[in-house]
Amino acid sequence: MERIKKQLTELIGHTPLLELSRLGKAHQAQARIIAKLEYFNPGGSVKDRIALAMIEDAEERGILKPGAVIIEPTSGNTGVGLAWVAGVKGYKTILTMPETMSVERQNLLKAMGAKLVLTPGSKGMRGAIEKANELRDNTPGAVILQQFENPANPRTHIATTAQEIWEDTDGKVDVFIAGVGTGGTVSGVGEGLKQHNPHIEIIAVEPDSSAVLSGDKPGMHKIQGIGAGFIPKTYNPKVVDRVIRVADDDAIRTGRELSLKEGLLTGISAGAATFAALQVASQPEYAGKNIVVLLPDTGERYLSTALYAFEEYPL
């Protein structure tokens, strides 16, 4: 039987699950930690899912027309997804991004054909959003897909990511953990899983130094991709059972451990989510349970960051 795809978008999703047995053993985990490896998506991250979903939703609603320009504020991964999906579909992209994002991310976006506009790092994602709105107002035919507000974001995780996890664990999932950038992943997957079993615990992860979900003020942090500094409309607190705060150092060291113990080259936010999973898995009440943690992207986008500052963060 022929198995040839017609275009790259057909390869989005159906990413594998991997048990982190060596890492779990090293940390005396009493629960089973299972990673959802989202860097198996064509663009290298979970954000391919929402890029395709938001573009197709906008097409169906008549918002995106031939020759349109897509503008989007991004910390990197959504931009990569939008750039390549838009390219496949014939749209141009202009992306706004805090200047503090890794040089790998910046170069990757340019390589994908996007025009990149950097904003002050001190303003975080709010600064990127403000700049995107300004560019839209001055660019004929421009559309902002609004990943922080667009219901197509969590909706695609309900329909795809959650169902994949449920099916691939044969319904044996007790806890789901994910970092919060837009909040679409943890909210959508959480809602999708709870449709099958309302007792599944959903845990959100945020930077300790910018813990706005926990009621603190926004602040600077090193965990790129999560901790936008505000609570997005795509984050649904009713789905989330609790929030775990993770310090930069713990996220970075755990990210490095994933590489050394499991051979997984992942990003800093994957380290944060995995650190949270290890904390939960060490508690006696979770003994024998299955914890699924979503690892959003590949570490190749962070080689110039603190994640690989070996002298500053020795293991």
Role assignments for model-derived ranges:
Residues 1-315:
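PLP-dependent amino-acid enzyme catalytic core
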